[in-house]
Amino acid sequence: MEIIPHRHPFLLIDRVLELEPGRRVVAVKNVSMNEPVFQGHYPGNPIFPGVLILEAMAQAGAVAVLSQPEFAGKVPLFAGIDDARFRRPVLPGDQLRLEVEMVAMRRGLGVGKGMAYVGDELKAEATLKFALVDAATPEPAR
């Protein structure tokens, strides 16, 4: 996962299964009971938070985008989330399969369609909007 800037404890993808640079990615997140978030979400009834599923999708999408040589070293930032839907809870022991397809990319701004599955069951989906910035500045890459 050296291609994206995220690190433990906020690196939310464990492995990339398929990659078409700039187009699509399939990655996995193994949801363990040892995740720090389960200390408070929710004790005795642990559920992996939807916002972290969205972040995992975004990190997977970042692998697809940042694997292109022209974007190497850039930092992806959320610019928006549309049509987010959470279908079923994700629980400790689940293997979350993250599928992200890039829909549009122009001048450092992009849109990806993300879906999260456990087995064949769709758990969440969203349209993710992002900006690529230089590591030293908060301005979008041009």
From Swiss-Prot:
Reactions catalysed: a (3R)-hydroxyacyl-[ACP] = a (2E)-enoyl-[ACP] + H2O
Subcellular location: Cytoplasm
Highest taxon above the source species: Bacteria
Active site: H41
Entry's Gene Ontology cellular component terms: cytoplasm; membrane
Function (record text): Involved in unsaturated fatty acids biosynthesis. Catalyzes the dehydration of short chain beta-hydroxyacyl-ACPs and long chain saturated and unsaturated beta-hydroxyacyl-ACPs.
Record organism: Symbiobacterium thermophilum (strain DSM 24528 / JCM 14929 / IAM 14863 / T)
Protein name: 3-hydroxyacyl-[acyl-carrier-protein] dehydratase FabZ
GO terms for biological process, alphabetical: fatty acid biosynthetic process; lipid A biosynthetic process
HAMAP family in the record: FabZ
Entry keyword set: Cytoplasm, Lipid A biosynthesis, Lipid biosynthesis, Lipid metabolism, Lyase
GO molecular function, one term: (3R)-hydroxyacyl-[acyl-carrier-protein] dehydratase activity
Record-listed E.C. numbers: 4.2.1.59
Family according to the record: Belongs to the thioester dehydratase family. FabZ subfamily.
Predominant subcellular localization, coarse grouping: cytoplasm
NCBIfam families: fabZ, PRK00006.1
Protein encoded by which gene: fabZ
CDD domains (UniProt xref): FabZ
